[in-house]
UniProtKB/Swiss-Prot annotation:
Residues 1-157, 218-345, 414-801, 853-872, 930-947, 1002-1025 are cytoplasmic. GO terms for cellular component: chloroplast; Golgi apparatus; plant-type vacuole; plant-type vacuole membrane; plasma membrane; vacuole. NCBIfam families: ATPase-IIB_Ca, ATPase_P-type. The N-terminus contains an autoinhibitory calmodulin-binding domain, which binds calmodulin in a calcium-dependent fashion. It comes from Arabidopsis thaliana. Residues 19-30 are annotated as: Interaction with calmodulin. Belongs to the cation transport ATPase (P-type) (TC 3.A.3) family. Type IIB subfamily. Mg(2+) binds at residues 746, 750. This is Putative calcium-transporting ATPase 11, plasma membrane-type. Keywords: ATP-binding, Calcium, Calcium transport, Calmodulin-binding, Ion transport, Magnesium, Membrane, Metal-binding, Nucleotide-binding, Translocase, Transmembrane, Transmembrane helix, Transport.
Length: 1025
């Protein structure tokens, strides 16, 4: 099978267009192309979207480079005049929405200057740049200037899915057969008897179509909900005089938005103020170089990303008037990329479908030949009646129905169903799966490279210890007793409040609230405990320049001017890095004294001591300058003020989650920017760093020769002081060694590693929009235990699909062979078209619902990972498929060829009674085998069964409908009511398959590291549900 599937391989992430086109061209037999490829990407649409995107990007380039220059020379009178409408005037505004949109879209600096810059626009939209929009005005602003929402494609109706299900070519052929059968039947047998066969087929087709459409419609609603969740972005704005967080969809014209590294620009707008703002416009214009935005070039476009710096912007245009909104409106949905499992199972379906087509043709040919031979023997070869035509039509319907049963198109669709179910459950468990393949791939992961802060720890940081003036002070509940001189205290408060990117605001109840990163919040809270006041500090100093924190420099700097005209630079960051920038230290009198080698060594010991207690350490430093530097702020000559130790407690349950991963064969590696002592202390507390494990610094790792790096990689459990490039190198090399790597990230610089990994996991709280966009899964609560839950559900998806494949292939084999052999030997098929359609629904839609939606049990995380190279259909599965198929073929074969004698069936209705028994026994074999398929290797198949209400409901419905078909729908399904003895016999024949399953599972099959994920029998421990 593996050799046959060589054309059905795609990369687990970002598959090439050529690979997708190759495997689709390999799918030679497709019953319903629209349905089979509906839940995955539409290659034509993707190509069309790319073409449109390029055209729009080219137009935007023209705007940037031609129109921008042209406006320098165009007379203002030639520009379009925008007349102010009464509605706008009545609302208290003095500028039209289209005028604002045109100004920003065309980068019309002349019009902006004429209006009066950001301040002038603020006046025209009746907003204060300091206070922001008033909440009471939101409704009127949305009414006049629009909402910040893009036009959504209308949801497809249920009838669309019904129509799609009807596109199945084999069902269409059967409908034609049914209509002809009704016509011929009524002509020969009269009304209503002549309608039964054809009407039975039509009713079966309607049932199949409705169940299929309902299943697909529910899936589409789930994906639509998930898509809406993906588009939720929280941004920071100033409203009612305070900084607050709002949804991107609640943004209005006039809002003052705060932007920082990694943010998405949420609407079109104008730069108000900021520092070193660089914007990545590649998603909009295609330009790879970042654009520098400042007061001279103040225009910001929706959909672009903040690559560096920070700023405040005034929103001028929202929703469909923005350039991004127009782009989104132009592009149609292209759908999801295929998951590797979908591709592989499409291959399996195609190969089996071709085999089934061969069997169907052979069955039809054999039945026709036997019929012709019988007529020739009877001497009536030249005499043909409408009854003969009806017989041939029945033969053709049986052949077509064999194709319906033979092509297991439910295989790839079961993957979608299972993934959709898992994605919905994970959503309630605080994990948003952005790409289908991620959930599937996560089940195969062999290692997780995780951040520390916020993922392993709570991200609720507090300053726990501080070193200042050669003394270590520890936090006593909510207070610090530092006993500092006024001069030292003032310098420390300055170093805290001047060098921050966060805000201290009052909430509606008047309580102090700190908005910003957890580290910033901890330091500002420390400053407030010292009695500092943010507003006072901001009034006394003017910020001249900011160099924001990033993962490479591991420090943040700010340049300020005092009221007296002095220029002072403040810096804070990783202790061992910032300490090297210091030449002096503040003494107890607030004076700067030289920093000797001995003192540096002493301070380094303090830092090491803090770190060994799992405290994050930061140095706060400053330096006075004669004048403001033109370029970057200095990297030396600073005076050390204090070393703070920040406590970030380990999350409850993380140690247990790490142990779960280790039991599951998943290696957990911690990759952090903290120093190695802090990293090791946290890693030991979490259970990550074990005996024999290696903790290494990023600088040492990146300088290793290739052969040494390969040798040490399997042992690395902690990487400290790492750069984003180190994380990318680690992930890349682990993948080269055959590992399936999941990696977490929250910063903009983590994007390459998230993109490189098999599964990128972005943090929902601490993560930037750039990180989220490059991730496959967003961990909404930033919790490591949630990551483990994603892995558990990924394994459940993989194993559930294995169960379904085992079940469906068994039905395929038996249905094909029993009808073919019977046709060859007896000249008739025991299973009619209506019966085969019912069997098809049992094994396709209902089987997928029952087996592909089983929730995970704890035992899944006690098994080795599947890995990258495992065969999907394992030896254990083949053993079960072959064993069950042989049993069913033997039993049904005996009934078919000797059933009348064994059961002592006589009389004119003996044949239909026997065929009903065969059909009923066949269905009950599948019912019991579906229960068997809940476990591939474990004997106890009932464990946790009643916790899966979907499975129980499907089993109950299947048995209930089978009783109705046999007892009450005989005219349509070619069955007759059975005696209780015959019912007992059918159930007994089906139940024997469960005893057989126990025996089969005791037959050892060769195992390897990457088996199907189940404990080997009989020694495997029992799972707890």
């Amino acid at each position: 099978m593996s050799n046959l599937l060589k054309d059905f391989e795609v990369a687990s992430k970002n598959p090439s267009l050529e690979a997708r086109q190759r495997w689709r061209s390999s799918v030679g037999l497709v019953k319903n192309r629209a349905r089979r490829f509906r839940m995955i990407s539409n290659l034509d649409k993707l190509a069309e979207n790319e073409k449109k995107r390029c055209q729009i990007q080219e137009k935007i380039r023209v705007v940037f480079y031609v129109q921008k220059a042209a406006f320098q020379f165009i007379d203002a009178g030639a520009r379009p005049e925008y007349k102010l409408t009464d509605e706008v005037k009545k609302a208290g505004f003095y500028v039209e929405a289209d005028e604002l949109a045109s100004m920003v879209r065309n980068h019309d600096t002349k019009s902006l200057t004429k209006i009066g810059g950001p301040e002038g626009i603020a006046q025209k939209v009746s907003v204060s740049l300091a206070e922001g929009v008033r909440s009471s005005e939101l409704h009127i602003r949305e009414k006049i200037y629009g909402e910040n929402r893009y036009t959504e494609k209308p949801a497809r109706s249920f009838l669309t899915f019904v129509w799609e299900a009807l596109q199945d070519i084999t069902l269409i052929i059967l409908m034609v057969c049914a209509v002809v059968s009704i016509g011929v039947g009524v002509a020969t047998e009269g009304f209503p008897k002549g309608m039964y066969d054809g009407t039975g087929i039509l009713l079966s087709i309607i049932l199949v179509v409705m169940v299929t459409a309902i299943s697909d419609y529910k899936q589409s609603l789930q994906f639509r909900d998930l898509d809406r969740e993906k588009k939720k972005i929280i941004i920071q704005v100033t409203r009612d005089g305070s900084r607050q967080e709002v949804s991107i969809h609640d943004l209005v014209v006039g809002d003052v938005v705060h932007l920082s590294i990694g943010d998405q620009v949420p609407a079109d707008g104008i730069f108000i103020s900021g520092y070193n703002l660089e914007i990545d416009e590649s998603s909009l214009s295609g330009e790879s170089e970042p654009s520098h935005v400042n007061k001279e070039k103040p225009f910001l476009l929706s959909g672009t990303k903040v690559q560096n710096g920070s700023a405040k912007m005034l929103v001028t245009t929202v929703g469909m008037r923005t350039e991004w909104g127009k782009l989104m409106d132009t592009l149609s949905e292209g759908g999801e990329d295929e998951t590797p499992l979908q591709v592989k199972l499409n291959g399996v379906a195609t190969i089996i479908g071709k085999i089934g087509l061969g069997f169907a043709v052979l069955t039809f040919v054999v039945l026709c030949i036997r019929f012709v031979v019988e007529k020739a023997t009877a001497g009536s070869i030249t005499e043909w009646s409408s009854e003969d035509a009806l017989t041939l039509l029945d033969y053709f319907a049986i052949a077509v129905t064999i194709i319906v049963v033979a092509v297991p198109e439910g295989l790839p669709l079961a993957v979608t169903l299972s993934l959709a179910f898992a994605m919905k459950q994970l959503m309630s468990d605080r994990a948003l799966v952005r790409h289908l393949a991620a959930c599937e791939t996560m089940g195969s992961s062999t290692c997780i490279c995780t951040d520390k802060t916020g993922t392993l720890t709570t991200n609720h940081m507090v300053v726990n210890k501080v070193w200042i003036c050669e003394n270590i002070k520890e936090r006593q509940e909510e207070n610090f007793q530092l006993n500092l001189s006024e001069q030292v205290k003032n310098i420390l408060i300055q170093a805290i409040f001047q060098n921050t990117g966060s805000e201290v605001v009052k909430d509606k109840e008047g309580k102090t609230q700190i908005l910003g990163s957890p580290t910033e919040r901890a330091i500002l809270e420390f400053g407030l405990l010292l009695g500092g006041d943010v507003d006072t500090q901001r009034r006394e100093h003017k910020i001249l320049k900011i160099e924001p924190f990033n993962s490479d420099k591991k420090k943040m700097s700010v340049l300020t001017s005092h009221s007296g005209g002095k220029v002072r630079a403040f810096c804070k960051g990783a202790s061992e890095i910032v300490l090297k920038m210091c030449e002096k230290v503040v003494d107890s009198n607030g004076e700067s004294v030289p920093l000797s080698e001995e003192k540096i060594a002493s301070i380094s010991d303090v830092i090491e001591g803090f770190a060994s207690e799992a405290l994050r350490t930061l140095c706060l430093v400053y330096t006075d300058l004669d004048e403001a530097p033109r370029g970057d702020l200095p990297n030396g000559g600073y005076t050390l003020v204090a070393v703070v130790g920040i406590k970030d407690p380990v999350r409850p349950g993380v140690r247990e989650a790490v142990q779960t991963c280790q039991a599951a064969g998943i290696t957990v590696r911690m990759v952090t920017g903290d120093n190695i002592s802090t990293a090791k202390a946290i890693a030991k507390e979490c259970g990550i760093l074990t005996a024999g494990g290696v903790a290494i610094e990023g600088s040492d790792f990146r300088n290793l020769p290739p052969h040494e790096m390969r040798a040490i990689l399997p042992k690395i459990q902690v990487m400290a002081r790492s750069l984003p490039l180190d994380k990318h190198t680690l992930v890349n090399n682990l993948r080269k060694m055959g590992e399936v790597v999941a990696v977490t990230g929250d910063g903009t610089n983590d994007a390459p590693a998230l993109h490189e990994a098999d599964i990128g996991l972005a943090m929902g709280i601490a993560g930037t929009e750039v990180a989220k966009e490059n991730a496959d899964v967003i961990i909404m609560d930033d919790n490591f235990a949630t990551i483990v839950n994603v892995a558990k559900w990924g394994r459940a998806v993989y194993i559930n699909i294995q169960k379904f494949v085992q079940f469906q292939l068994t039905v395929n084999v038996v249905a094909l062979i029993i009808n073919f052999v019977s046709a060859c030997i007896t000249g008739s098929a025991p299973l009619t078209a209506v019966q085969l359609l019912w069997v098809n629904m049992i094994m396709d839609t209902l089987g997928a619902l029952a087996l592909a939606t089983e929730p995970p049990n704890e035992g899944l995380m006690k098994r080795q990972p599947i890995g990258r190279t495992a065969s999907f259909i394992t030896r254990a599965m083949w053993r079960n498929i072959i064993g069950q198929s042989i049993y069913q073929l033997i039993v049904l074969g005996i009934l078919n060829f000797a059933g009348k004698q064994i059961l002592n069936l006589n009389g004119p209705d003996s044949t239909i009674v026997l065929n009903t028994i065969i059909f009923n026994s066949f269905v009950f074999c599948q019912v019991f085998n579906e229960v068997n398929s809940r476990e591939i290797e474990k004997i106890n198949v009932f464990e946790g069964m009643f916790k899966s209400w979907v499975f129980v409901a499907v089993m109950t419905a299947t048995v209930g409908f089978q009783v109705i078909i046999v007892e009450f729908l005989g005219a349509f399904a070619s069955t007759v009511p059975l005696s209780w003895q015959h019912w007992l016999l059918c159930i007994l024949i089906g139940s024997v398959s469960m005893i057989l399953a126990v025996g089969l599972k005791c037959i050892p099959v060769e195992s390897n590291r990457h088996h199907d994920g189940y404990e080997l029998l009989p020694s495997g421990p029992s799972d707890s549900a």
